[in-house]
């Protein structure tokens, strides 16, 4: 079960822009991530590689934690991610991440957001 302090450390890492590093430090080796109803990606190395590939496609990303809740081994985070692509186009995703933790690391995470929002 994560402590509030541990969750706050994770959030701070993401907000600082260290997305791949946060996965390396805060996810179990066998962790999974799932986008809406898509098939989950499994394995921390796979998750890190995917995150790095996403970040290579953008000029910048701003990550904001709107709210977070810890309830035992379950965590909910409302994130807002604002992307600026190399083309200059932008996109904003307001999403909820539901996480299941094992001890002080994330084991399973699922993101819920509106996938139909095009880049501005």
Where are these regions (language model features)?
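A solvent-exposed, acidic/Ser-Thr-rich amphipathic alpha-helical stretch
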Residues: 5, 18-72
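Short, cysteine-centered beta-strand-loop-beta hairpins and adjacent loop/turn segments enriched
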Residues: 57, 83-92
């Amino acid at each position: 079960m994560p402590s509030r302090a541990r969750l706050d450390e994770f959030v701070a890492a993401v907000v600082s822009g260290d997305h791949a590093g946060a996965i390396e430090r805060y996810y179990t080796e066998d962790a999974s991530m799932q986008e809406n109803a898509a098939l989950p990606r499994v394995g921390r190395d796979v998750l890190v590689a995917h995150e790095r590939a996403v970040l290579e496609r953008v000029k910048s990303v701003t990550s904001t934690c709107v709210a977070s809740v810890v309830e035992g081994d379950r965590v909910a985070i409302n994130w807002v991610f604002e992307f600026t692509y190399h083309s200059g186009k932008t996109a904003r995703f307001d999403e909820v991440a539901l996480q299941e933790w094992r001890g002080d690391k994330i084991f399973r995470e699922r993101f819920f957001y509106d996938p139909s929002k095009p880049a501005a």
